């Protein structure tokens, strides 16, 4: 590393080299920078090689042209009579910046000018360099802009995606309004094999049990953002974006082989976070709620979701909650990500578990539960190497997690064992075991 006189010689040679390098001068160069802050005071500073490239040489006089309102300002070359500032050059110690010891700088520290041209909540500014003009404009503070929209309107409006209708039904009972609902049941392999199209089933379930104003029966991967933006323009601001992203490919219930196969045929749900994040950028909700299985938290998809939301300005809270700690019958753990423009979200505190036996709930439905003792799937439970859910018995104090395959009578479904017989829980019993309100209609 050159020092002393050698350092000066090194810098001099570097400047000579820069003079003869065939640098192409573009029409426009842009940057996005943060204000330099000293206490409560802000400085607008651009330290860049591109200033020189675009014609703003060290020693040049410049003048400021304020924009309209708080729209920033422009900088143009100026003569001695009109100049208010000057372009200068910063020299770095060769030890720390030997590859680039010189850099051209424009700086503005007058608080009157800055406060007149940039809102107080602005944290960053955009720089557009052209030949003979540099334009500084404020970059909107996303979190502030979102929060500001709810000063004169209710925040209890939601964009709800992929819930099957249950979450919306409960939300409406709590005073929320589902302005826009995105609901579409993906076509599964068993649907294709049987020639069925059930893409509207969850959507119809939503309409039976809730009152969305706008219903989008579209695949989350193919929803056009321009159309979504146009629909949002017809709505009041959205306070909550609620996503129950597909959990199959994060769940231990799906085999590694099936997960690989779903990647090949594009039925995987791992990448649902990508369209969800793009939609959140358009919806601009004050709060985002993502619900999934616990494995989602440690997955690449979960990391991408959380990191991107933090970059957007949201404060992140993650938690894994067990239904038994909140009055449910199922020992079902779910992961929740709450991303809010308001800091300080406090997760709900677990309640004391009831601890009583579950049989009174089961017994009143037992007459409607089918006897499936002789089914092959029941016999297969004894020979499989996989861990099967425990039978519901007179001694049970909780219910294992009920999967979406429950109704198909698979071997790892939840069953009742009593008096030497095996029973398949009825629809009404499953609804009660899953703590789905009686008011939720599944009879249609």
Please give the residue ranges for each predicted region.
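Extended repeat-based interaction scaffolds and adjacent low-complexity, acidic/S/T/P-biased segments
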Residues: 2-7
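C-terminal target-recognition/interaction regions appended to catalytic cores
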Residues: 9-27, 40-42, 50, 59-149, ...
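Beta-strand-rich non-transmembrane domains
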Residues: 32, 36-40
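Eukaryotic intrinsically disordered and solvent-exposed regulatory patches
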Residues: 47-51, 167, 323-324
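Short polybasic/polar patches that bind polyanions
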Residues: 52, 172, 310
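Core alpha/beta nucleotide-donor-binding catalytic domains of modification enzymes
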Residues: 147-284, 294-298
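Class I S-adenosyl-L-methionine
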Residues: 230-235, 250-408, 417, 421-423
